[in-house]
C-alpha cells in the first residue's frame, strides 16, 4: 500500500508547481557580525504557540535563524514580496504602506489603493512571536504563488512591527493547520485546496545545503528527483502544528535525549535544532562542546571525529552527521543545537532547516502525515 501511495504522488510530479527558494544570511549571522547576538539571545523565550480570537501567539516562532525565502505576489496588478514559507505558523502577512515602524522602511510594503481586487476586512490583528510582534488589520486580495492563484485570500497587513528590522524577508506565509490561524480566516494552502488548485493537497521542501540557489518548495505533488530511496511516512500527532512523535535521540549507540519518547515540530521557519536545555546540554557534553558567548563551540580539529546524532522517528533512524550539525564560522565551529523549549507543555523538539537539508520533506494535509527521505 505504501508503494501505491508513493507512485501516486510521484505520478503527480508533472502537475506540481515548483517555486525556487533562496538561501539568505540569517539574522543570527548578521547580529554576530555586529557583536549584538548576546543581547538578542538574552531576551528570547520559547513556548508553544496558541490562538485566541484575533490575537495569535507564536512565542516559539523565532526568525533569528530563518534562511530560505521565496517570492509571491498580492493584488491586481501584482505587487511582489519575499516571504518565508513557514510550516510553524498559519497566517499570511506583509507590511502595509502606511506602516510607520523602522522595519517597514527596509522592506517592501503593500499599497491597497494600487490593487483593484483588494478588500479591507477591517478586523484588527496582533501576532506575537518569540522574536517580535506585528499589529495591523486584515485584508483580502488575490495571492499568487508561482502559477497558483488564491482568490479572495485573507491576509494581514502590518501597521507596526517590532523585531523584524534586519530580517531578510518582507512577510510570512504560514503553512500550518487552520487551527493555528487567525480566527475566521482561511490559510492560503486551504484556500488553494478548496478552489481545486491542485489534485493532491501536499507540499514539499528541498533545501540545498551550501548554495544560495537550488532550494525549492513544491505544491500539489512530489518530484522524486529531489530525494533518494522511498518516502517514510510519519503520522502527525496533533492537528495544529506539523508535529510528530519521536522515539529517541542517540549518539554512539547510547540514548542521550528523548529516552521515553517526545514530540518534535518540523519547522522550515528556523535553521537550528531546539530542545529542552538540560537535554541539549547532555548532547553538548558528548561533543566536548564549551559555552562561548551564548553558543556552544567545539574544536574544529575534532569535528571529523564526532559521532552522528541519530533521531529515531517512527522506528526509522535519521542520522545527522557532524558536518551538518557543526557550522564553521571564520575560525569557530559552532553547534546548531539550542536549548529553551522546556517552557512548552510537552518535551518538545524543533527540527529546523539543518535537519531538513538532509531529508526531503513532504507535508500531506489530507492524510495528516509527513514523509521523509534522504535528499539528493
From Swiss-Prot:
Cross-referenced PROSITE patterns: ASP_PROTEASE (PS00141), PEPTIDASE_A1 (PS51767)
Domain Peptidase A1: 68-373
Record-annotated disulphide pairs: 99-104, 258-262, 300-333
Keyword hit for Transmembrane: no
Localization: Secreted, Extracellular space
InterPro entries tied to this protein: Aspartic_peptidase_A1, Aspartic_peptidase_AS, Aspartic_peptidase_N, PEPTIDASE_A1, Peptidase_aspartic_dom_sf
Gene Ontology BP, a term: proteolysis
Molecular function as annotated in GO: aspartic-type endopeptidase activity
Keyword Protease attributed: yes
EC number of the protein: 3.4.23.-
Region forming the signal peptide: 1-15
Positions annotated as glycosylated: 51, 71, 114, 248, 252, 343
Active site: 86, 267
Tissues of expression: Trophoblast and placental tissue. Localized to both the mononucleate and binucleate cells of the trophectoderm.
Post-translational modification remark: N-Glycosylated; the glycans terminate in either N-acetyl-galactosamine (GalNAc) or N-acetyllactosamine. Terminal GalNAc on Asn-linked glycans is greatly reduced prior to parturition while lactosamine-type N-glycans remain unaltered.
GO cellular component: extracellular region
Family, per entry: Belongs to the peptidase A1 family.
Protein name: Pregnancy-associated glycoprotein 2
Record organism: Bos taurus
Lineage, top ranks: Eukaryota, Metazoa, Chordata, Craniata, Vertebrata
